[in-house]
């Protein structure tokens, strides 16, 4: 079988769909609600809570083609990308999953059928080898007796990583939790390629390539290392799309598959490269995939966390383009070819193409300004190097001053067979981090450590008051049985009308009360399937299993509802006015205002802001019903519902519709009709990052308060100019005209004063070796008048060196003028540098005119007295 990469992806999904699996869309590269993970790096990431028993799905079998990034953190392939046949920053992981449904028998037989059946991948059976965990007799027997793989091609792999269950064939999510043996399938490329089978001394060669890993989650590892059987064993498998494509397309390198051939050709086209074997072409072809999809999923280049990893990848690509001879910005031009080769897998990227291109172009333009200077510094340092290692301080200086990620510096060094002292770099980086931490004052957030195994039923769509039972209590992140007055805690209820913060909407506030205790809720957060009420017990004692009345702050909730509904209208209005490329990139909805971040590549024009505001208010006046409907996720997408950036959705989703104007997926609380919002006013429009804009706005009471504030301001201004709001513009124009006239008259008086001062000064010039020298400290003269006075004195004296100084607010202002006939001997810039240094300042300028400032007023007389000797030494 020889199919395109896109056809292979679809065939995999079709096969498992035919076996009763739900086809689930790829999740975002930004993991949802998993702070332990930098990027999505495996197909199972989006199902982690399902495997942990914290989440449930409507299906027990799933299949995906998951976008993954491995660059930064534990899984960092960046430095090897471009130099090996199979390392990538971005790849697609094909996977099938069983959540307590089938286990080893079906998982193994499904894999073998897909790989070897004539209807599907039709690989030669004799080319396939498998590994199993050393003690996993069950898997071994299935491969040998049911599938029929010869014993010599089934290899048992034991604990080869230095500890119990530390093996290539034993998978674990972490130090504790679900884990189990795995079985890997390898493809033998043939004896013309060096390498040995897995487990042999030559296993690192390229002959035997792992194409599929089947993980059997059957144990729950305890903190003491004990392995307890899981009540419902599960299956998690992963097969790299690029690897299986290389096998099916009969090539030995992932970079030779159709997808990369087309991308590499596009890279050569935009950079002007002619050597198609250059590793730089492979680097750039790989990097455009990770960069474009990361930006599409909401990551923006920055100097922190995910944004910094993205910046590193972009800058590495730009530097390789520079090596290929690219003369202008090129990287953003690869987004369109990428969309073309990725096919249906790039549908979301295509919607945001303009924004992604703009972010990449802006980042490239910014880095281009420092790239050449940084490379010149690096070349200089390397030319002076006596050993084979560049010191960490220099690598850090390149990062700190020129924006060179250390792996980019390492790339340059590698090409010259040199290394970077990465430990020294990390020491310098850690010193900077320590300084930042010491100045930040951040403390520990114990609540972020809470793990709740129970679930809470949310009733807040229909209720703001609810009778409930306390199911868990947490103090300083630790579970407790009771809390006492004055203690801060998190209270979990079996059901609650309180909305837990999510989707940009802040958590509710209010009270939990019973006859003997009152708990003041200052925030509400989600902890897995549970809703936690964060706050302080103001009176009494509260225990687990106590009954309470949960009372939401209704006034605050209502303001939040209006602001949240307004964000939906704003989103739709922005797409209507600016274009379909607009996508939500974040939001904050509280009781005071709303904040909405969206993709757009330039600042909005005032008329666009007004148009958006008018359009939102028009929908408010239409007083459309705000309707919700629960449906399948795929059905919602077919209906055109827009998904919220960074949010994880269940299979059954809540679709919020406002007439024919807005349809979005949303789990928040909302107005009943758009008319409830009352009024919408935009406060500000600004940029937060390249390609990301932000609008802040107010609604209802907040919008009316803003109008009152603006009206009061107009009244105050009208009073100041002795008018009223009806003729305010005319009055202000009259005041401005008079102000300009007075400024002109004042300037004329200052010019006259300067001329008079100059005339009186000219007589005090001295002759130094036949040259006129005038040095004077002036009182009550503005610094900006000094230049005019020097020009006047030059005209009066004909040939002269002039030094003038004045002081204002404990600061010294200096100017030196030299007529052009004397600049061969005395340069104004050199003279003023000498004077400025004496008064604690610096300055410079042309040979005939230079200015400077200083801070030591007391030293000025002596500095001016030194001028005569300085000039005499040069005449």
UniProtKB/Swiss-Prot annotation:
Subcellular location: Cytoplasm
GO BP, one annotated term: alanyl-tRNA aminoacylation
Binding locations of Zn(2+): 564, 568, 666, 670
Record keywords, A-Z: Aminoacyl-tRNA synthetase, ATP-binding, Cytoplasm, Ligase, Metal-binding, Nucleotide-binding, Protein biosynthesis, RNA-binding, tRNA-binding, Zinc
Superkingdom as given in the UniProt entry: Bacteria
Cofactor(s) listed: Zn(2+)
GO molecular function: alanine-tRNA ligase activity; aminoacyl-tRNA deacylase activity; ATP binding; tRNA binding; zinc ion binding
InterPro entries, per database record: aa-tRNA-synth_II/BPL/LPL, Ala-tRNA-lgiase_IIc, Ala-tRNA-ligase_IIc_anticod-bd, Ala-tRNA-synth_IIc_core, Ala-tRNA-synth_IIc_N, Ala-tRNA_ligase, Ala_tRNA_ligase_euk/bac, DHHA1_dom
Record-linked CDD domains: AlaRS_core
Cofactor binding remark: Binds 1 zinc ion per subunit.
Disulfide links within the chain: none
Gene Ontology cellular component terms for the protein in this record: cytosol
EC numbers on record: 6.1.1.7
SMART domains tied to this protein: tRNA_SAD (SM00863)
Catalytic activity line of the entry: tRNA(Ala) + L-alanine + ATP = L-alanyl-tRNA(Ala) + AMP + diphosphate
Subunit organization: Homotetramer.
Record family assignment: Belongs to the class-II aminoacyl-tRNA synthetase family.
Comment, domains: Consists of three domains; the N-terminal catalytic domain, the editing domain and the C-terminal C-Ala domain. The editing domain removes incorrectly charged amino acids, while the C-Ala domain, along with tRNA(Ala), serves as a bridge to cooperatively bring together the editing and aminoacylation centers thus stimulating deacylation of misacylated tRNAs.
Reported function: Catalyzes the attachment of alanine to tRNA(Ala) in a two-step reaction: alanine is first activated by ATP to form Ala-AMP and then transferred to the acceptor end of tRNA(Ala). Also edits incorrectly charged Ser-tRNA(Ala) and Gly-tRNA(Ala) via its editing domain.
HAMAP family: Ala_tRNA_synth_B (MF_00036_B)
Name the UniProt record assigns to this protein: Alanine--tRNA ligase
């Amino acid at each position: 079988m020889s199919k395109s990469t896109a056809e292979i992806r679809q065939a995999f999904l079709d096969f498992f769909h035919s076996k009763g699996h739900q086809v689930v869309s790829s999740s975002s590269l930004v993991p949802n609600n998993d702070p332990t993970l930098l990027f999505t790096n495996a197909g199972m990431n989006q199902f982690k809570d399902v495997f942990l028993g914290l989440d449930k799905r409507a299906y027990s079998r799933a299949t995906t083609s998951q976008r993954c990034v491995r660059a930064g953190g534990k899984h960092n392939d960046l430095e090897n990308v471009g130099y090996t046949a199979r390392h990538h920053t971005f790849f697609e992981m094909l996977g099938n999953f069983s959540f307590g449904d089938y286990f080893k028998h079906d998982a193994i037989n499904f894999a073998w059928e897909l790989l070897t059946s004539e209807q599907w991948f039709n690989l030669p059976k004799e080319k396939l080898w498998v590994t199993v965990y050393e003690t996993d007799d069950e898997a071994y027997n299935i491969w040998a007796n049911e599938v029929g793989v010869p014993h010599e091609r089934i290899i048992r792999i034991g604990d080869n990583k230095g500890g119990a269950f530390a093996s290539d064939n034993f998978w674990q999510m972490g130090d504790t939790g679900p884990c189990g043996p795995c079985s890997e399938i390898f493809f033998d490329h043939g004896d013309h390629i060096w390498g040995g089978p897995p487990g042999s001394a030559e296993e690192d060669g390229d002959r035997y390539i792992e194409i599929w890993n089947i993980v059997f989650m059957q144990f729950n590892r305890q903190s003491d290392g004990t392995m307890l059987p899981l009540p419902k064993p599960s299956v998690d498998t992963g097969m790299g799309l690029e690897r299986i494509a290389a096998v099916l397309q009969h090539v030995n390198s992932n970079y030779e598959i159709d997808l990369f051939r087309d991308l590499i050709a596009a890279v050569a086209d935009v950079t002007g490269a002619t050597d198609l074997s250059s590793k730089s072409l492979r680097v750039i072809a790989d990097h455009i995939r990770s960069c474009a999809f990361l930006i599409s999923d909401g990551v923006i280049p920055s100097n922190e966390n995910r944004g910094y990893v993205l910046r590193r990848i972009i800058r590495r690509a730009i530097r390789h383009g520079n090596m290929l001879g690219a003369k202008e910005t090129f990287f953003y031009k690869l987004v369109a070819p990428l969309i073309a080769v990725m096919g249906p897998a790039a549908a979301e990227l295509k919607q945001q193409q303009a924004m992604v291109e703009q972010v990449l172009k802006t980042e490239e333009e910014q880095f281009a300004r420092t790239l050449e200077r940084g490379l010149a510094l690096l070349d200089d340092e390397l030319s002076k190097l006596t050993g084979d290692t560049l010191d960490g301080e220099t690598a850090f200086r390149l990062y700190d001053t020129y924006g060179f990620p250390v792996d980019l510096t390492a790339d340059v060094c590698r090409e010259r067979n040199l290394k970077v002292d990465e430990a020294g770099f990390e020491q310098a980086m850690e010193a900077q981090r320590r300084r930042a931490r010491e100045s930040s004052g951040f403390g520990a957030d114990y609540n972020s450590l809470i793990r709740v195994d129970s679930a809470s039923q949310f009733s807040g769509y229909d209720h703001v008051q609810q009778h409930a039972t306390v199911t868990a209590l947490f103090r300083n992140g630790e579970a407790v049985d009771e809390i006492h007055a004055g203690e801060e805690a998190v209270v979990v209820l079996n059901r609650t009308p309180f909305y837990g913060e999510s989707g940009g909407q802040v958590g509710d506030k209010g009270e939990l009360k019973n006859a003997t205790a009152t708990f003041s809720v200052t925030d509400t957060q989600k902890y897995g399937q549970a809703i936690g009420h964060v706050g302080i017990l103001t009176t009494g004692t509260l225990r687990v299993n106590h009954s309470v009345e949960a009372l939401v702050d209704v006034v605050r909730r209502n303001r939040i509802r209006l602001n949240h509904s307004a964000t939906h209208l704003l989103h739709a209005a922005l797409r209507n006015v600016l274009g379909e490329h607009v996508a939500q990139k974040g939001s904050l909805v509280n009781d005071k205002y709303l904040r909405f971040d969206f993709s757009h590549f330039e600042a909005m024009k005032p008329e666009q802001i007004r148009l958006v505001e008018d359009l939102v208010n028009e929908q408010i006046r239409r007083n459309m019903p705000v309707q919700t409907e629960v449906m399948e996720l795929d059905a919602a997408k077919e209906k055109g519902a827009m998904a919220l950036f960074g949010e994880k959705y269940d299979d059954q989703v809540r679709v919020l519709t406002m007439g024919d104007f807005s349809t979005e997926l949303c789990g928040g609380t909302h107005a009943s009709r758009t008319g409830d919002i009352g009024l919408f006013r935009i406060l500000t429009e600004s940029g937060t990052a390249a390609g990301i804009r932000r609008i802040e706005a107010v609604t209802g009471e907040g919008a009316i308060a803003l109008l009152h504030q603006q009206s009061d301001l107009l009244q105050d201004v009208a009073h100041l100019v002795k008018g009223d709001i009806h003729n305010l513009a005319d009055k202000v124009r009259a005041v401005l005209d008079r102000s300009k006239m007075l400024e002109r008259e004042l300037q004329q008086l200052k010019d006259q004063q300067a001329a008079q001062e100059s005339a009186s000064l000219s007589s005090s010039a001295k002759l130094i070796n036949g040259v006129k020298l005038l040095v004077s400290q002036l009182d009550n003269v503005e610094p900006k008048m000094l230049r005019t006075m020097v020009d006047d004195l030059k005209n009066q004296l004909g040939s002269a060196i002039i030094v003038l100084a004045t002081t204002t607010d404990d600061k010294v202002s200096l100017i030196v003028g030299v007529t052009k006939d004397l600049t061969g001997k005395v340069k104004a810039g050199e003279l003023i540098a000498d004077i400025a240094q004496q008064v604690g300042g610096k300055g410079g300028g042309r040979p005939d005119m230079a200015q400077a400032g200083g801070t030591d007023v007391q030293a000025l007389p002596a500095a001016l007295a030194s001028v005569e000797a300085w000039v005499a030494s040069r005449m």
